[in-house]
A protein has these predicted regions:
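Rossmann-like adenosine-cofactor binding region
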Residues: 168-237
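Phosphate/diphosphate ligand-binding glycine-rich loop within oxidoreductases
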Residues: 2-119
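Glycine-rich adenosine-cofactor-binding loop
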Residues: 104-106, 120-148, 155
Length: 274
């Protein structure tokens, strides 16, 4: 699918900021712009200076900006207003620019909560959540709201790990030694394409073998080493590409005010994964 419309002075520009951008968001949003005949354009960037990049969003009239690892917390002081979701989680993945006023949201939470419900993941399961950054905060909040009462925040950084665990009434651990969990969640860059840990599992094979549900929020590649191994073992898997698609359509709604029907959403998500 190729963009037929000619870019002109009235074209609304949306963008993303990530340390390691993928083509998923670019293909997803531009597919929907084309399908709905909207005068919008989406482009991914990898900023060398976050403060200047956010200033550019404001100064150039960029309509919307997606925020990915590792900028989800660092951009908070750079915006004018936090939506209730971003304020509660203290993590941002979306910025909407309305006449120079930058308001930040967190649509990661929506995606995670929806997927836990769609896959009927029982809140009775004991979980292990690896990570304590912006995405981990959204996951922990969604788990708490879904009724999960027993779980571990596994984070090397003791300060942020303990803070996140205490906020939601969970237990912090520096590693997974001695943990037996039915639900394993990775909210770190382990397994992400282009990184030093791209080929690594975020949990050991033995830990995956003992679990029943595996949830990896890493979207690139669509099948991470963790997801591949879990599928081979017949586990229920929830992928980062599913998270990405749901949070992206919620961003699309914030940017354009239009909600695509489910059939169009599925087509855009499928196109994005090619």
């Amino acid at each position: 699918m190729f963009r037929r419309a000619i870019i002109n002075k009235d074209t609304q520009v949306c963008m993303s900021l990530a340390a390691r951008p993928s083509n998923f968001g670019t293909r997803f949003h531009n597919y929907l712009y084309e399908a709905l005949d909207l005068n919008y354009l989406y482009k991914a960037f990898s900023p060398t200076d976050l403060t200047q990049a956010i200033s550019g969003v404001r100064g150039l009239g960029i309509r919307g900006c997606a925020i990915s690892m590792p900028f989800k917390e660092a951009c908070i002081p750079l915006v004018d207003e936090l939506d209730a979701s971003a304020q509660a989680i203290h993590s941002v993945n979306t910025i909407v620019n309305t006449n120079g006023h930058l308001k930040a949201y967190n649509t990661d939470y929506i995606a995670i909560a929806r997927l836990l419900a769609n896959y009927k993941v029982s809140p009775d399961l004991v979980f292990a959540l690896r990570g304590s950054g912006g995405m981990a905060k959204a996951v922990a909040c969604a788990l708490k709201d879904a009724g999960f009462t027993r779980g571990y925040i596994v984070a090397i950084d003791e300060a942020s790990g303990k803070q996140l665990a205490e906020l939601y009434g969970y237990e912090w651990r520096p590693d997974t030694d001695g943990i037996e969990a039915d639900l394993l969640i990775n909210a770190t860059p382990i397994g992400m394409a282009g990184g030093n840990d791209a080929d690594k599992l975020s949990y050991s094979e033995q830990e995956v073998d003992k679990a029943s549900v595996i949830f990896d929020v890493v979207a690139l590649p669509p099948v991470t080493p963790l997801i591949r191994y879990a599928r081979e073992r017949g586990k229920t898997v929830i992928t980062g590409s599913e998270v990405f698609a749901i949070q992206a359509v919620e961003q699309f709604v914030l940017y354009t005010g239009i909600r695509p029907d489910d059939a169009l959403f599925q087509k855009a998500a499928a196109w994005s994964r090619l």
